[in-house]
């Protein structure tokens, strides 16, 4: 049964891959949103981008929550096709909150000069929760605090990286405040600390 399901998923992924290749030329910007948990952090950035551009999303989980015609989602289940998608990607920019580019099946494309931009899903120390080579292959890494900015510059110098840090707002906080505006501030702070602890433990 498991073998049959794997074969079915493989053929479904091939169809999805073909659809992706047909549509890809209509996009400059893409997001790799690995799962629903990461979507919580990337959605504010996706929403911002779709105000001006069409956005392509690559995911490993079903994320059918967007009602926006500017968003096209491609969901892949099998690792072979997932890696093939990354290796053949033809975009100008790919945003993600998944680290370890080139250290897993998440690879840089061989078919374009795509720029890879890392967006933070945690405000904690970069040295504390990530592998030492987690950001080696990104062209730009978001920092959402002065401490993260200094940390990445230290990492960059130590590992002789070409990628640059950039400061920007942590849009997840802004979105969370908006969604939880009816709750007392103490509950909001507790909730944010709890989510931060979850990220750290993962």
Regions from the language model: what does each represent?
Residues 38-41, 62-68, 103-104, 149-152, ...:
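Short, charged/polar "capping" segments at the starts of alpha-helices
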Residues 26-28, 115, 188-189:
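Residues that mark the start of a beta-strand
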Residues 38-39, 96-111:
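An aromatic- and histidine-rich active-site surface loop
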Residues 31-36, 58-62, 96-100, 120, ...:
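Structural motif
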Residues 87-89, 135, 183:
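A short, aliphatic-rich alpha-helical micro-motif
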Residues 1-90:
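N-terminal pre-catalytic "stem/leader" segment of glycosyltransferase-like enzymes
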